């Protein structure tokens, strides 16, 4: 049966990628249909109840700057907010929030149902309709066909999904939801390179059975941060604490004893899991020298007693899960409400995608999220927004858009995927970016909102707020440049042991000094109106203070390009290179690249690692030059 209404764009899947894709397409005026197996799980947080973190928070801010929903929904659902790396430089500071699962789903659904040009339908997609190598629509499990000019697949872990608990396994997209088996078979028939990946989740624990008295409390930050550039703290629900505990040697012995029934260690699971979110059994085996691992006990919401024990993801048998949980301090009497499990699923080599996230082999078919080999809500949402945007641009017969690596972490993410591919689930880190000093959380709107407005992603309300903020920043910078401080006034900031300074300085020049912040600066001068808005004040201070560093980083990237063809020694032992992570060392020793350029294109090799390689090579060349000179001098002496 053919559905009478034709659509411009159909989005398949209602997770973080699918909801952002559907909202983006509809915001751009496309008649959009979002198909999902269950309308009650739109925006579901399938694993951890948190948004943001290092690299991930940057993506959330960029999604927000382009008009996306994730940041605003988190502000309405966040029950604890923290700034990670707050003592470090602004490039690596990152917002992270614990979210109430129910409130987050509700916030996303409100936005979907309020969005013009967007319809929702609960139905499972089993097949794709093609005319030659062009997508024309989809077919559901009820035999209903829907026509569209573009289709965005955001199917998460549902393609051929198999869940594992010990020796038991069953088909599932996640616990409680069926896998997409027919659609997986259909995609495998196409000229696409397919592989299997794996992820996992920990058992959930009833908070009423936890002894919090002996645990370490982890409260949120004060003042409470916000995620969205349009957000404020009045949107936040009640704030609560998380808690910390640790595994111990008894825990590890229980895990080691149970490995003979672990699907990870008995060959049942073939998919590769996320390196940076390993299961507890992986941690115990790979880091056998460690006698403890930290566990964060994270509330799943305000109206539930369930706790997410972040750090003990596992697919061990349920009886082993109970034993290992109860071996941990504070959890001796813990009741598990849901067992942990691992899940294997299909993904497709993202190198078969264009930067628009359209497949190269099927015209009008876009992929976003875990189908491309990524892991994480934030990575999925960023891809979804970009896929929805580019599907819309394609229908409008306009050029596709993807930010470059120096414009956004979204650009870094997509460039890494489509040029390097993945061998394991891809997670965003700030270390993956060459330009991270200018790709900060605080300036995501300055980098992207104007483009988003031009493309039709950004609302008039957001644009007006952005324009006012941008003007306020430039006005304040001008005031700082034109306001000069006399030596007498400057002495107020000096300590008794500092020598007297008889020169005058502009406030702009003073703000460049690492020991002087914007707040101290404002107290020096009553001339002109200082900034009240904290976002504007923060932006001004960072822009001024790091101006020189950003310029130097740009020059460093130019130098990297010049080193592209630098030859690496054959059979080089990368363990000798100081500062390289275990991951980077392992991959370089495995691939043995011939040049710096080849090394840079290996999946997982970061710009920071390339810098360390260059330093190592330069030191080696310097030592060789000294030896040659010594030999030359020695030869002259003998003669």
UniProtKB/Swiss-Prot annotation:
Q: Which UniProt keywords apply?
A: Cytoplasm, FAD, Flavoprotein, NAD, tRNA processing
Which Pfam family is an annotated match for this chain, by its short name? GIDA_C_1st
Record flagged with keyword DNA damage: no
Question: Where do the annotations place FAD binding?
Answer: 13-18, 125, 180, 370
Name the coenzymes or cofactors required. Answer: FAD
S-S bonds: none
GO CC, alphabetical: cytosol
Binding site residues for NAD(+): 273-287
Q: Which GO terms describe its molecular function?
A: flavin adenine dinucleotide binding
SUPFAM superfamilies in the record: FAD/NAD(P)-binding domain (SSF51905)
Q: Which PROSITE patterns match?
A: GIDA_1, GIDA_2
Residues annotated as coiled-coil are none
Q: Which domain of life is it from?
A: Bacteria
Q: Where in the cell is it found?
A: Cytoplasm
Which GO terms are recorded in the biological process aspect for this UniProt protein? tRNA methylation; tRNA wobble uridine modification
- List the PANTHER family: GLUCOSE INHIBITED DIVISION PROTEIN A, PROTEIN MTO1 HOMOLOG, MITOCHONDRIAL
Q: What does the sequence similarity comment in the record state about its family? A: Belongs to the MnmG family.
Job of this protein: NAD-binding protein involved in the addition of a carboxymethylaminomethyl (cmnm) group at the wobble position (U34) of certain tRNAs, forming tRNA-cmnm(5)s(2)U34.
Per UniProt, subunit arrangement is: Homodimer. Heterotetramer of two MnmE and two MnmG subunits.
Q: What is this protein called?
A: tRNA uridine 5-carboxymethylaminomethyl modification enzyme MnmG
């Amino acid at each position: 049966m053919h559905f009478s209404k034709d659509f411009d764009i159909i989005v398949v899947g209602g997770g973080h990628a699918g909801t952002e894709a559907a909202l983006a397409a509809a915001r751009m005026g496309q008649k959009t249909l979002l198909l999902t197996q269950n309308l009650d799980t739109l925006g579901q947080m399938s694993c951890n109840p948190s948004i943001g973190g290092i690299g991930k928070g940057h993506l959330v801010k960029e999604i927000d700057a382009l008009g996306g929903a994730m940041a605003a929904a988190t502000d309405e659902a966040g029950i604890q907010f923290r700034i990670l790396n707050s003592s470090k430089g602004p490039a690596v500071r990152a917002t992270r929030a614990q979210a109430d699962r129910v409130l987050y789903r509700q916030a996303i659904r409100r936005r979907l149902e309020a969005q013009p040009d967007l319809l929702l339908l609960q139905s499972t997609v089993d097949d794709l309709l093609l005319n030659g190598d062009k997508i024309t629509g989809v077919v559901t499990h009820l035999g209903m066909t829907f026509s569209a000019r573009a289709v965005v697949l955001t199917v998460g872990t549902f393609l051929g999904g198999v869940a594992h608990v010990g020796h038991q396994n069953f088909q599932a997209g996640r616990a409680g939801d069926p896998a997409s088996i027919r659609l997986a078979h259909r995609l495998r028939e196409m000229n696409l390179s397919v592989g299997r990946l794996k992820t996992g989740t920990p058992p959930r624990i009833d908070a009423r059975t936890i002894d919090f008295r002996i645990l370490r409390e982890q409260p949120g930050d004060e003042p409470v941060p916000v995620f969205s550039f349009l957000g404020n703290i009045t949107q936040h629900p009640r704030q609560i604490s998380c808690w910390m505990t640790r595994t111990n040697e008894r825990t590890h012995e229980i895990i080691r004893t149970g490995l003979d029934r672990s699907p990870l260690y008995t060959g049942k699971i073939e998919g590769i899991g996320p390196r940076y979110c390993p299961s507890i059994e992986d941690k115990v085996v790979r880091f056998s020298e460690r006698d403890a691992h930290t566990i964060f006990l994270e509330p799943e919401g305000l109206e539930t007693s369930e706790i997410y024990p972040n750090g003990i993801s596992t697919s061990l048998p349920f009886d082993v899960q109970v034993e290992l949980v109860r071996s941990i301090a504070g959890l001796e009497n813990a009741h598990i409400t849901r067992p942990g499990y691992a899940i294997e699923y299909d993904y497709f080599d993202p190198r078969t995608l264009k930067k628009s996230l359209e497949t190269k082999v099927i015209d009008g078919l876009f992929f976003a999220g875990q189908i491309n080999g990524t892991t994480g809500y934030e990575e999925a949402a960023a891809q979804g927004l970009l896929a929805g945007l580019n599907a819309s641009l394609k229908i409008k017969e306009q050029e596709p858009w993807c930010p470059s690596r120096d414009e956004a972490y979204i650009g870094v993410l997509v460039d890494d995927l489509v040029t390097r591919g993945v061998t394991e689930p891809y997670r965003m880190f700030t270390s993956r970016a060459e330009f991270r000093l200018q790709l900060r959380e605080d300036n995501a709107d300055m980098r992207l909102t104007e483009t988003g407005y031009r493309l039709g992603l950004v609302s008039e309300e957001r644009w007006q707020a952005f324009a006012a903020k941008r003007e306020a920043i430039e006005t304040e910078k001008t005031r700082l440049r034109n306001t000069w401080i006399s030596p007498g006034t400057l002495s107020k900031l000096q300590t008794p042991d500092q020598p007297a300074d008889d020169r005058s300085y502009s406030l702009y020049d003073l703000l460049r000094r690492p020991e002087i912040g914007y707040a101290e600066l404002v107290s020096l001068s009553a001339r002109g109106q200082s900034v009240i808005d904290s976002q504007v004040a923060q932006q001004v201070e960072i822009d001024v203070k790091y101006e020189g560093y950003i310029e130097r980083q740009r020059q460093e990237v130019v130098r990297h390009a010049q080193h592209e063809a630098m030859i690496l020694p054959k059979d080089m032992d990368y363990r000798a290179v100081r500062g390289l992570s275990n991951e980077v060392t392992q991959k370089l020793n495995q691939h043995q690249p011939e040049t710096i350029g080849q090394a840079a294109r290996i999946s997982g090799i970061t710009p920071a690692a390339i810098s360390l390689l260059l330093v190592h090579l330069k030191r080696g060349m310097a030592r060789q030059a000294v030896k040659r000179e010594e030999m030359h001098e020695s030869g002259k002496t003998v003669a």
